[in-house]
Amino acid sequence: MSVQGPRLVLDIRALTPNLRRPLIMCLVDHLLGSDATETIVVISDHEPAGLGYQLELRRETRGRVGFSYDQRLDGAWVALISLKP
């Protein structure tokens, strides 16, 4: 998993669970609305498969973002949300 170009790193491990997903969606929506090209790197303490599923289901983001994730050696999960042009 590699990131090329500008990236925004968001470590959500210290946030309460009820704030995590809304914060990520708000950030993705804002960047999509501003024609940004950053890749969002989300660091989490659990597998983020549900986040990718939600991005595909949402009307606002469906087909407009790429999503992949992997687990680091230290146990943290890293998800990449890439904005499609």
Give, region by region, the residue ranges found by the protein language model.
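Residues in flexible loops and secondary-structure boundaries
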Residues: 18-23, 50, 75-77
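A generic structural signal for short, non-catalytic loop/turn and secondary-structure boundary residues
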Residues: 3-5, 60-62, 72-74
